[in-house]
C-alpha cells in the first residue's frame, strides 16, 4: 500500500485552462511553501479525526486535492492519502477503486513522513493540477476520483476547454442562429460542482425539434446535388440518378419519375412527337368565385395554382401525350406527371388522353398509358368525373371494335378516378414494384368506415397475389418487356423486313 500527501497548490494557468479548473484556491499555500500552511498542519495533527461512519459533514468541507499526473495511473490500486481540508484539519484517506472501498482515519501516523515529502516535492507545477469539490457523501468521493482520472485523460489527448468551447460555439452557430426562429425546445443542461467562488460547469445542448426555415435549412446548399430515398433515406447523387432510372442504389426502391424522364426511358431518341401541347385549363366552373363571402379557403385560386405548376414543371398539364418509337415500333403514349397537381385528372387531362386513343385507333397504333395520379381534380367538379366515362368510351372502341393493343402501367401512386377508369382497362396491366395502387386512400377509408387499414394492403406486391393486375416489372427490363409484348401482338419494328 503506497502513501501520498495531498496538499494544496496553484497550478499554472495553461494547465488550469486545459482541465477546466477553478482558479480560486481559498487562500491556501502552494506545495513546497511552508510559511504558514506546514505549521498549520502540524498544529492540527493532534486533533482526533473520526472514521467515515462518525465523521460529521454538517459543516461543508472543501477538499483541495492534488495529483501528480505522472503517478495518476497508480490510483487504480489501493492507496492511502494524507488530506487537509479548508479548515486546516488533516486526516488520512484510504480508497480502493477496484473494490470500491473508501475510509477516513486519524492522520497522526503520517506526520512523520511530512517533512521528507515536502523536501522531495517537485517545484514544477506543470505536473500538477488542483481540483475543488464539495463532498457530503461517500459516493461523491468515488465520483471525484473518477473525474480526476477523466480530467487527466482529457489533458493527455489535448482536449482542453478551449477546444470544447470552440466546438460548442461552432455547433451552436451552425444550428442555433440568431436569425432562425424555427428551432423549438432548445434546452441547455448544466451540471456544476461549486465551492464558494469556484465552480466547474459542463454544458451540453439538446435539440428536440428542428423545423425548416428560409433563413436556415441544412438542405439549402446541397439539395440540388442529392436525392433522398423515401424508403431507406439513403442519399443518391442526383447527377447519376436519372441514368439509374430513379432507382435507389442502396435498397432498390423505385422513386417517382417525371413524365419527361419516362418518355426518355421508353421512346427512341429523335422519334418523340408531342400532341396537344397548347391545351390548358381555364377554370370551367370558376371554382373560387362562388360565394366569395362565405367561402373561406386559404388556398390560392385555381388559375394561379395552374400557373404555378406550369412554371414549376415546364408542362401545360398533368399529362404528356404523343407518338414515338419503342425499339423502332411506332406507338402512341400518354404519361401522367404526379408533380403537376398530384397528377389529378381534369377536363384537359381527359381530353388529351381521349384524343390520343382516337389518334391511335385511326393509325392502328398500340397505346401505352403510364398512370401516376391522385384521382379526379376536385376544382373542376363534375367535369373531371365525366372524363372517366369519356376515356372509357374511347378505349372501348379502340379495344373491342378495332381489336388493338392497350397497355396500362400503374406507378406510385395510382388512385381515385384513374384507377376506376382507364388505369384498369388495359389488355395488359403492368405495375411497378412497391407501387401504391388504390381507389380510396388509406386515410379516407379509415375516416369513412372507422376501421384501421393494415400497412401494405394497397401495395403492388399484395394486390398482385389478389389478381388485380398482370405482372410486376421493374424499370430496368420494362422497355424490353414492352417490346416483346408488342411483337407478340403483331406490332413489328419499322426497319424489320
UniProtKB/Swiss-Prot annotation:
Subcellular location as annotated: Plastid, Chloroplast stroma
InterPro entries documented for this protein: AcCoA_carboxyl_beta (IPR034733), Acetyl_CoA_COase_Trfase_b_su (IPR000438), ClpP/crotonase-like_dom_sf (IPR029045), COA_CT_N (IPR011762)
Superkingdom to which the source organism belongs: Eukaryota
Function noted in UniProt: Component of the acetyl coenzyme A carboxylase (ACC) complex. Biotin carboxylase (BC) catalyzes the carboxylation of biotin on its carrier protein (BCCP) and then the CO(2) group is transferred by the transcarboxylase to acetyl-CoA to form malonyl-CoA.
Assembly behavior: Acetyl-CoA carboxylase is a heterohexamer composed of biotin carboxyl carrier protein, biotin carboxylase and 2 subunits each of ACCase subunit alpha and ACCase plastid-coded subunit beta (accD).
PANTHER family per UniProt: ACETYL-COENZYME A CARBOXYLASE CARBOXYL TRANSFERASE SUBUNIT BETA, CHLOROPLASTIC
Protein name: Acetyl-coenzyme A carboxylase carboxyl transferase subunit beta, chloroplastic
Higher taxonomy: Eukaryota, Viridiplantae, Streptophyta, Embryophyta, Tracheophyta
Amino acid at each position: 500500500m503506497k502513501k501520498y500527501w495531498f496538499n494544496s497548490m496553484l497550478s499554472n494557468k495553461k494547465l488550469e485552462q486545459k482541465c477546466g479548473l477553478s482558479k480560486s484556491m481559498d487562500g491556501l499555500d502552494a506545495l513546497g511553501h511552508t510559511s504558514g500552511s506546514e505549521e498549520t498542519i502540524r498544529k492540527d495533527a493532534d486533533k482526533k479525526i473520526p472514521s467515515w461512519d462518525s465523521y460529521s459533514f454538517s459543516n461543508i468541507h472543501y477538499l483541495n486535492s492534488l495529483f501528480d499526473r505522472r503517478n495518476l495511473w497508480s490510483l487504480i490500486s489501493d492507496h492511502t492519502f494524507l488530506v487537509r481540508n479548508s479548515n486546516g484539519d488533516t486526516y488520512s484517506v484510504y480508497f480502493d477503486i477496484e473494490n470500491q472501498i473508501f475510509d477516513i482515519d486519524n492522520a497522526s501516523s503520517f506526520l512523520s513522513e511530512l517533512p521528507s515529502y515536502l523536501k522531495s516535492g517537485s517545484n514544477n507545477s506543470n505536473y500538477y493540477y488542483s481540483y475543488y469539490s464539495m463532498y457530503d457523501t461517500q459516493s461523491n468521493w468515488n465520483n471525484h476520483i473518477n473525474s480526476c482520472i477523466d480530467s487527466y485523460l482529457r489533458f493527455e489527448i489535448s482536449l482542453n476547454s478551449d477546444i470544447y468551447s470552440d466546438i460548442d460555439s461552432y455547433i451552436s452557430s451552425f444550428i442555433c442562429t440568431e436569425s432562425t426562429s424555427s428551432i423549438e425546445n432548445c434546452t441547455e443542461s448544466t451540471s456544476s460542482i461549486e465551492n464558494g467562488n469556484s465552480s466547474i460547469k459542463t454544458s451540453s445542448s439538446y435539440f428536440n425539434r428542428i423545423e425548416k426555415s428560409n433563413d436556415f435549412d441544412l438542405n439549402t446548399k446541397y439539395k440540388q446535388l442529392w436525392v433522398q430515398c423515401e424508403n431507406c433515406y439513403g442519399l443518391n447523387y442526383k447527377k447519376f440518378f436519372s441514368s439509374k432510372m430513379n432507382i435507389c442504389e442502396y435498397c432498390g426502391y423505385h422513386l417517382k419519375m417525371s413524365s419527361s424522364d419516362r418518355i426518355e426511358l421508353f421512346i427512341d431518341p429523335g422519334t418523340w412527337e408531342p400532341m396537344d401541347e397548347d391545351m390548358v385549363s381555364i377554370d370551367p366552373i370558376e371554382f373560387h368565385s362562388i360565394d366569395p363571402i362565405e367561402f373561406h379557403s386559404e388556398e390560392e385560386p385555381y388559375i394561379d395554382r395552374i400557373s404555378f405548376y406550369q412554371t414549376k414543371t415546364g408542362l401545360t398539364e398533368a399529362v404528356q401525350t404523343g407518338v414515338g418509337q419503342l425499339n423502332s415500333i411506332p406507338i402512341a403514349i400518354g404519361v401522367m406527371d404526379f408533380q403537376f397537381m398530384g397528377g389529378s385528372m381534369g377536363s384537359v387531362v381527359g381530353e388529351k388522353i381521349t384524343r390520343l386513343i382516337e389518334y391511335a385507333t385511326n393509325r392502328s397504333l398500340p397505346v401505352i398509358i403510364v398512370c401516376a395520379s391522385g384521382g379526379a381534380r376536385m376544382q373542376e367538379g363534375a367535369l373531371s368525373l365525366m372524363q372517366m366515362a369519356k376515356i372509357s368510351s374511347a378505349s372501348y372502341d379502340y379495344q373491342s371494335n378495332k381489336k388493338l393493343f392497350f397497355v396500362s402501367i400503374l406507378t406510385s401512386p395510382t388512385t381515385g378516378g384513374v384507377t376506376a377508369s382507364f388505369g384498369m382497362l388495359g389488355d395488359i396491366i403492368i405495375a411497378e414494384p412497391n407501387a401504391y395502387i388504390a381507389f380510396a386512400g388509406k386515410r379516407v377509408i379509415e375516416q369513412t368506415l372507422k376501421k384501421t387499414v393494415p400497412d401494405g394492403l394497397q401495395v403492388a406486391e399484395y394486390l398482385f397475389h389478389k389478381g388485380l393486375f398482370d405482372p410486376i416489372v421493374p424499370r430496368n427490363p420494362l422497355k424490353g418487356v414492352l417490346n416483346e409484348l408488342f411483337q407478340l401482338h403483331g406490332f413489328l419494328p419499322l426497319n424489320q423486313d
